[in-house]
Amino acid sequence: MRYLPHSEADRAAMLATIGAASVEDLFRDVPREALDQAAFDALPDHGGEMEVERALSALAARNLTAGSVPCFLGAGSYRHHVPAAVDALIQRGEFLTSYTPYQAEVSQGTLQYLFEFQTQVALITGMEVANASMYDGATACAEAAAMAVRITRRRKVLMAGGLHPHYTATTQTLLACLGHEGEGLPPDPLALGDLIGRVGSDTACVIVQNPDFFGRLRDLSPLAEACHAAGALLVVAVCEPVSLGLVAPPGAMGADIVVAEGHALGSPTGFGGPGVGLFATREKYLRQMPGRLAGETLDESGKRGYVLTLSTREQHIRREKATSNICTNSGLIALAFTIHMTLLGEAGFTRLAWINHANAVALAEKLARVKGVKVLPETFFNEFTLRLPKPAAEVVEALAARSILAGVPVSRFLPTYPELANLLLVNATELTTPEDADALVAALKEVL
């Protein structure tokens, strides 16, 4: 294929169309030091494999890795033990792709695991039907908002203050492009009573997270009743899927759509990704659900087989009739999720959730005894918020110098809210040992 580069006129026309003054404007979100041309010019022209490996290893050694030091990071990306069998199985050549096969019925193994994935998601969320995965939790949340708009024929989406900021931003982006209204409430979470009062006749749906961004667990039943009384839908987002092994499923509390980030089961944290979006809903909304749905059937010989039952995306049907434009999806991460869940089993999943909660409670009790530290949420799963006597970012930096990954400052996600600067998100999982907790407590006493 002949290479035909864009001309200056082509580039100028494209920049004008999107409202950018220069190519550099496209990279304004990238830190300036990362775009320093002098740093690129200083790179050696070439190097042997050993030299390059040695140089990169030296750079990597400057980082603190979650597996080598006490780690309490969370805020939407949670570190759990992943059985070795998961990685071994997903690297089989038959599975090592993110694609749903175009000749779907030829790939019975892929369709079967997608069917099992859907079954697992429906069971843990307490819903009737689930799709074959979305890109990640945030995009699943955005698709849920768009789905609610289609179902209710209303244009306003209300997002609770406890919704993860990335989920809020992603949802607002999609709604703006579709010409709908997305209202994100202040991040200092409102009581459900206040949120209930905002639900009106123009509300398509209310989106809440449980446990929320700050770690709070709530009974969502009153909110669900208020939404349904107003003709709106309740969308529940779950960032930590392990919580569903212990907490009442959203479906049991009246949710109409449940979305979740599933990468904590089966995948390492990996700088927060890649993710896999879980999406479940009521059967009556099946045909408004985005993405794909794998189904079980019998062939002409009476043997069980699997098919793509629904694919209401623009590559399969007319664009104006499509429910989404999801393309290459997170099928491989969905497979990892499915294998991990299968290895755990129902009893193992529940036990894993109990261990997470117990470790978090033990950690919170120890931290609450540190002078100047207050544990904010009264009810939580495996993550909670600390109010510190000084900016959380400073504390995190000081503890990193002591080889402790203390948690995530809320200000990292919400920098425009100075009243939240002293809040620190702290997470504990089955990998958190009593020694890790003691190390964090001792270090906090030193730096506060």
Swiss-Prot record:
Gene3D superfamilies: Aspartate Aminotransferase, domain 1 (3.90.1150.10), Type I PLP-dependent aspartate aminotransferase-like (Major domain) (3.40.640.10). It catalyses: N(6)-[(R)-lipoyl]-L-lysyl-[glycine-cleavage complex H protein] + glycine + H(+) = N(6)-[(R)-S(8)-aminomethyldihydrolipoyl]-L-lysyl-[glycine-cleavage complex H protein] + CO2. It is an enzyme of class 1 (oxidoreductase). One of its GO terms (molecular function) is glycine dehydrogenase (decarboxylating) activity. One of its GO terms (biological process) is nucleoside metabolic process. It holds the Pfam family GDC-P. Keywords: Oxidoreductase. Its EC number is 1.4.4.2. HAMAP family: GcvPA. The glycine cleavage system catalyzes the degradation of glycine. The P protein binds the alpha-amino group of glycine through its pyridoxal phosphate cofactor; CO(2) is released and the remaining methylamine moiety is then transferred to the lipoamide cofactor of the H protein. The glycine cleavage system is composed of four proteins: P, T, L and H. In this organism, the P 'protein' is a heterodimer of two subunits. Belongs to the GcvP family. N-terminal subunit subfamily. NCBIfam families: PRK00451.1. This is Probable glycine dehydrogenase (decarboxylating) subunit 1. It comes from Rhodospirillum rubrum (strain ATCC 11170 / ATH 1.1.1 / DSM 467 / LMG 4362 / NCIMB 8255 / S1).
